[in-house]
């Protein structure tokens, strides 16, 4: 059985926008609607869980009504951090199956990437999509000096980060630590090693106004 937890706790501050970024409309619909539609098109039998702050849930219901969003999904309240939000999402899932944990503001994930993540997680336990870094990298030190580092030793990490449910649930029993930047870091802290799969360039996390413009063009194609 396949599950997807869509984490949508954004505030929209970097957008210079009062509307939380997952609700900003592009190509005729809120970003979050595009994201869940993408997963539904990938697999209509997937169980979708959206994690939203309590004070945004009524607004989301209204948006679903306005935009006629009828894709079946459960909504669970977000927590104090992303870690706690994912934990709340996991609490709705039985202990068997494969779960993809995905950013609500990544509506352009290629279906081949989602399929690869599910397939590899089923085989190996955990899978995360990554991309090589196109730009040069520099490390900055406390005294403001910097030095070039080898970018081939690094990758950019995307979502959906996908795991066997029993393993990621076990990992999320660990006490919260602020070094947990994503689900893979929690998974690793529990002693597991996620496999890396190839991501897709268009799978951008909509964070800045320029991302909105790019996503709008892609979604209208």
Language-model segments: residues:
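Conserved N-terminal catalytic core of the sugar/cofactor nucleotidyltransferase
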Residues: 33-96
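N-terminal glycine-rich phosphate-binding loop and ensuing alpha1 helix
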Residues: 1-58
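A recurrent flexible, glycine/aromatic-enriched loop bordering the glycosyltransferase active site
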Residues: 147-157
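Residues at the starts of beta-strands that form the adenosine-phosphate
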Residues: 46-48, 126, 193
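Residue-level signal for inorganic ion chemistry
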Residues: 6, 32, 89, 102-103, ...
